[in-house]
Structures are given as structure tokens and as C-alpha cells.
């Protein structure tokens, strides 16, 4: 984005011409910026080559999701609707993670029927329901368990999700209990430690503290994810 002779341009297209063609207000997305952000993320994590999952709740525009799919990324969804959009954008099921609180039985059944990569669970009750569905479906489902790392994200109080007093995620004690209880389950495979500490985080320090807490509990559990 830049100014040329007093006019604002987005990827060499003037904002004025966009407004004349589509009217205002109008949302404008930069493919160039999105692609550069993705490449930058991949570059910084190239030594471990992770599966990068785009948060569909941040932008469910199908054109954006189509681009995400073409670039080989996965998707993180929090509802059946988002899962359907991700699939419609040709994002491979084995690259889709279903996260979030309040998943319905219908949503869990749908996700399992689509053979997605992973379901991040928020409670023991959710694991119990997944086991029931898996038993009837004769499948073994990959799950994650959300851990509360008791980390201050240094963000707005109402969007903080990683402190002990927040309602999200499980305490260390509960997490270790569920890990032990379900590690030999015939119907769920604990494949992931899930964690989320908040939004609008402007410093790397909260992430460093979070990773220290995650590393500690993994070592204590002696479990190989």
C-alpha cells in the first residue's frame, strides 16, 4: 500500500477506482500481502516445517480460503459452518483442525465423518462424547487436549484466555489426569497439546512464557505427542 501523486494505491490499483467500481464501504484484501505473510511465517519455521493452519474465524471469505488452499496451508475451524467452507475451498481434510468451545454432538459427528486431522477438546465430557461417536463409527480419532498454561498475554482483560482464572483450558493437574486416563483408549489418540492465550498480543514474551509452561508439562508427563 502506498501513495502516488496524492492517491492511495493497493497493489498498484487506486483506492479511488475501487470505490467507483464497487461503491463504499468496501473490503479490499491484498493477495500480495497475504502471500508474503505466509512465506515469512514459513521461512521463520522452516527448521521444523510445521503444518500452518489458517484461522477461518479470522476471515472466512472463500477467495481468501481458496488462496490458502492453493498455498498448501491447513485450516483451524471452530464450527461446522467454517469446516464446510474450508472443505469447499478444497482444503484437505487431513489438514483441518477443529478447535473451540461449545461444539455440538452434530458438529463432532460431522467432523469425524469427514476424517479431519484433529479435534482439539476442551473438557473430559467432550472426550467422552467423541469416544461414543468413534465407537459407533469404528474409528480411532486424533484429539488434542487444551491446556491452560497460566500465562499473562498482556492483552485486554476480556480477551485473555491463558491465565488460570480464565475459563478456558485445563489446569496442569486435570490435563495430566486426562492424559493418563485416555492414553490407551481404543477410540481416541491423544496427538496434541492445544493452547491459546489470547488475541492482539504485541510482544513475543507471552509466547515465550507459554512455551516454557508447555515444555515443562510435557516433560512432567513423559508423554510423546
PLM region descriptions:
Residues 1-141, 180, 185-189, 222-223:
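A charged N-terminal "starter" segment
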Residues 102-103, 124-126, 148-152, 198-200:
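Short acidic/polar capping segments at secondary-structure boundaries
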Amino acid at each position: 500500500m502506498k501513495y502516488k501523486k496524492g492517491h492511495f494505491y493497493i497493489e498498484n490499483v487506486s483506492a479511488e477506482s475501487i470505490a467507483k467500481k464497487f461503491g463504499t464501504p468496501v473490503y479490499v484484501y491484498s493477495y500480495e500481502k497475504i502471500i508474503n505473510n505466509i512465506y515469512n511465517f514459513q521461512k521463520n519455521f522452516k527448521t521444523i516445517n510445521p503444518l500452518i493452519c489458517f484461522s477461518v474465524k479470522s476471515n472466512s471469505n472463500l477467495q481468501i480460503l481458496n488462496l490458502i488452499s492453493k498455498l498448501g496451508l491447513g485450516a483451524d475451524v471452530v464450527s461446522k459452518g467454517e469446516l464446510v467452507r474450508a472443505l469447499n475451498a478444497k482444503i484437505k481434510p487431513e489438514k483441518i483442525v477443529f478447535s473451540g468451545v461449545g461444539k455440538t454432538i452434530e458438529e463432532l459427528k460431522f467432523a469425524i465423518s469427514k476424517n479431519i486431522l484433529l479435534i482439539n477438546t476442551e473438557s473430559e465430557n467432550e472426550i467422552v462424547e467423541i469416544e461414543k461417536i468413534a465407537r459407533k463409527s469404528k474409528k480411532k480419532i486424533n484429539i488434542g487436549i487444551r491446556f491452560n498454561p497460566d500465562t499473562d498475554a498482556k492483552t485486554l482483560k476480556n480477551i485473555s484466555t491463558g491465565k488460570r482464572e480464565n475459563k478456558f483450558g485445563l489446569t496442569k493437574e486435570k490435563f495430566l489426569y486426562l492424559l493418563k486416563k485416555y492414553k490407551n483408549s481404543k477410540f481416541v489418540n491423544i496427538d496434541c497439546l492445544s493452547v491459546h492465550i489470547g488475541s492482539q498480543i504485541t510482544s513475543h514474551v507471552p509466547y515465550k512464557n507459554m512455551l516454557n509452561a508447555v515444555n515443562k508439562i510435557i516433560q512432567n508427563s513423559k508423554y510423546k505427542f
